[in-house]
Amino acid sequence: MAKKKTQNSNTIALNKKARHDYFIEERFEAGVSLAGWEVKALRAGKGQLTDSYVIFKNGEAWLLGAQIQPLPQASTHFVTDPTRTRKLLLHRKELTKLKEATEQKGHTVVATALYWKHHLVKCEIATAKGKQLHDKRQTEKERDWNKQKQRILQTNQR
């Protein structure tokens, strides 16, 4: 009898810090232009999105700050730069919408997730507005209060 394959998650990397530092407003799915060694490294789980963001140059979107560590068995015939800028593949309407969002004061575009969709690597990017220190404290208070409410409800149901 054949063994069942373990169900792997499609998520490669998450940017949890983005949810802490920004108010996430609108999300978009973008393709990522990668080299062969980068795809192989992502299959091994070597991707990281902490402090990654999107810039716009010449009508194109570029992902900065994303790190993909090369595998030790990667070819030595070319330079493997873990933090190189990677082109994001978006439709023209999405590009203009994102560019307009970044022109507002305090808004930026950050990468929130990197995942597999069929055999392709996709990057979830989002327009975001920066949080100030008191905003971060407020969300933490709300989170703690929600946990306390759940505990109270569970003890009352017993």
Swiss-Prot record:
The keyword RNA-binding applies. CDD domains: SmpB. Gene3D superfamilies: 2.40.280.10. One of its GO terms (cellular component) is cytosol. It is found in: Cytoplasm. Keywords: Cytoplasm, RNA-binding. Residues 132-147 have a biased composition (Basic and acidic residues). Residues 131-158 are annotated as: Disordered. GO terms for molecular function: RNA binding. Required for rescue of stalled ribosomes mediated by trans-translation. Binds to transfer-messenger RNA (tmRNA), required for stable association of tmRNA with ribosomes. tmRNA and SmpB together mimic tRNA shape, replacing the anticodon stem-loop with SmpB. tmRNA is encoded by the ssrA gene; the 2 termini fold to resemble tRNA(Ala) and it encodes a 'tag peptide', a short internal open reading frame. During trans-translation Ala-aminoacylated tmRNA acts like a tRNA, entering the A-site of stalled ribosomes, displacing the stalled mRNA. Belongs to the SmpB family. PANTHER family: SSRA-BINDING PROTEIN, TMRNA-BINDING COMPONENT OF TRANS-TRANSLATION TAGGING COMPLEX. This is SsrA-binding protein. It comes from Teredinibacter turnerae (strain ATCC 39867 / T7901). The gene is smpB.
